[in-house]
Amino acid sequence: MIDLTSEVHITRLYNAINSARNGMRPFRENRTSMLREYVGRNYNGNGSDHEVIVNLIAQTADVYTIGLASTNPKVTITTDNKELISFADRFRVGINNQIKEMRFSETLQHIVLDSLFGLGISKTHLAATEPIQLEDDIWADIGTIYVSRISIDDFVMDLSAKEVRRCKFMADEYRVSWEDCKNHENFDKQILQKMSPTSKNDRTESQANDISAGYITDDDEYEPMVDLIDIWLPELKAIATFPKHMQSKPLAVLPWDGAEGGCYDLLSFSDVPDNVLPSSPMSNLKAL
């Protein structure tokens, strides 16, 4: 089992993350190539290098996205206990309202679209909130649920596993305000003292976002930013947050008490035996 206080184990973890990131590069490059076909030739000058008369990729993406994620899902909560029927109905309304408030249908549409080009990835977040009064004498601390879409450009997973459920790690990389990072109450202050803002130029490969953003630059960021990485470790049932560009002990370790599979959920259409990364429907249409 990995020990997050051991420098040897942390070095191995960073090496495994870097190896997996390099191993996923061809998949990201193929996805970017398919996205160029998806947007066509007239998208910011960075789309397809040839005229696309009948865009089968775009048409297929529209049909699947509308068909699979056109609206918010709804939950139904029932009980055999007559005394809890009223509570169950209130709970149902509360959850459905929460799903609507966090615009889950929009997130789901993006995840479905991602899956058509390779892999759709969602990340579940849970933040504590003040207790909510349901009845005169009943309070519930349900927390604030949030689901975000993770781009495969920012995602890393254990490629040595033959099944997703056997992956020893999954991770997502993201940029946050350096000011917010420094002032985060749960981050290790000793590690923060060794950190500094980082540049987007620190990454070594292009991303799909560059199709619209153009050249990689920090001029579009009005404040200093820093790159972090959240790593889901099934053995520890925890999420560890590390600096991306500086090997160190974790800034924070958050125990996970949610679903058994962890905070990430993956959606794919064309799984490949003995491989955790799938093929994609769009790869079969690209040649057409």
Q: Positions of the model-derived regions?
A:
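Extended, helix-rich architectural segments
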Residues: 1-263, 271
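Structured mid-domain segments that build the active-site/substrate or prosthetic-cofactor binding neighborhood
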Residues: 262-263, 267-288
